[in-house]
A protein has these predicted regions:
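Helix-to-loop junction immediately C-terminal to a conserved catalytic motif
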Residues: 68
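Conserved ABC transporter NBD signature motif
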Residues: 76-86, 91
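Conserved ABC ATPase "signature" region
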Residues: 115, 119, 124-139
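Catalytic Walker B motif of ABC-type/P-loop ATPase nucleotide-binding domains
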Residues: 168-172
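ABC transporter nucleotide-binding domain
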Residues: 184-269
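Short, charged/small-residue-rich alpha-helical element at the C-terminal edge
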Residues: 238-311
Length: 311
């Protein structure tokens, strides 16, 4: 892909505006006694990259379908760009959607597809410029059926960002892309954000969410299990220090769970402090901490903890 040829704006400054781009309040979607979405509330600020994550069946897709105007909620309110999602005339042209499976006509060419979807969006852009942005210029006259999986994803992205919409939904945007194409896509997203676009991301690549998202909503059984910045989410679980001590060593100076063969594990919310205490103690005792490893909590750890927590 090539860089987006657009002006540079401010992006998200971490402060929620008076009128958020997305405002969801007490949202419910029920099928009889089953609640696909239950009492869900959250806001997305202008220029923010907000990641909506969760296990399969957590309610992400249903939530996004309601926000995008494709499904009606049982109860609750949703505001998108200051309007109801059902007010398609006020919202549709200002919103771009990259679906996981686009369903483009296989007989249309790349240029025809971008032109058709772009025209339906009622946004203004140059078709060939957008094709060039996603590095499909050489495929402009190629039919969709003849594209590779990665090329189809780039075409999906092109139709979503055509005309620089204010709000962009990216559903698994890097699936099927090689590393270089992933990097190019994220650079393009960065440029869109600099120009003020708001991004809502769903992905199974947790490292992408951890690196890219301003805030994350973790869904479980139809509602939020946790929500916040990566730092806020990871602070809810302890970091881990692991090491081995020689046989006959005195116990370590900090609470640790002992395993076989002199192996110890420390769970801590003050990683740097406890690690320094442990290292100083080992030095004073003349002991070697074998297999020493320490690491902060990752988003993957938080995600895995969802299944361990009671409902």
């Amino acid at each position: 892909m090539r860089p987006l040829l657009r002006g540079v704006g401010s992006g998200w400054d971490g402060v929620m505006s008076t009128t958020p781009v997305i405002d969801v309040h007490q949202l419910n979607l029920a099928y009889g006694d089953f609640h696909a979405v239950k009492d869900l509330s959250f806001r997305v600020g202008q220029g923010e990259l907000y990641a909506l994550l969760g296990t399969n069946g957590a309610g992400k897709t249903s939530t996004l379908e309601i926000i995008e105007g494709h499904r009606k909620a049982t109860s609750g309110t949703v505001s998108v760009l200051g309007h109801s999602p059902s007010d398609r005339g006020a919202v549709r042209s200002r919103m771009g959607i990259m679906l996981q499976e686009s369903g483009f006509s296989p007989d249309l060419t790349v240029r025809e597809t971008v032109g058709l979807i772009g025209g339906l969006s009622r946004r203004v852009d140059d078709v060939d410029r957008v094709i060039d942005v996603v590095d499909l210029k050489r495929k402009a006259t190629t039919r969709v059926s003849q594209l590779s999986g990665g090329e189809k994803r780039r075409l999906d992205f092109a139709t979503a960002v055509y005309g620089g919409p204010e709000l962009i939904f990216l559903d698994e945007p890097t699936t099927g892309l090689d590393i270089s194409s992933r990097d190019d896509l994220w650079r393009a997203v960065d440029r869109l954000r600099e120009d003020g676009s708001t991004i809502v991301l769903t992905t199974h690549y947790l490292e992408e969410a951890q690196q890219r998202a301003d805030r994350i909503g973790l869904m479980h059984r139809g509602t939020f299990h946790r929500e916040g910045t990566v730092a806020e989410l990871t602070q809810t679980l302890p970091a881990v220090i692991g090491f081995r001590l020689p046989a006959g060593s005195p116990p370590p100076p900090i609470p640790a769970a002992a395993a076989s063969a002199g192996a110890f594990t420390v769970e801590t919310f003050q990683l740097q402090f406890d690690l320094r205490v442990l290292l100083d103690w080992a030095h004073q005792q003349g002991l070697e901490l074998a297999d020493l490893h320490a690491g902060p909590t990752s988003l993957d750890d938080v995600f895995r903890a969802i299944g361990a927590d009671p409902a």
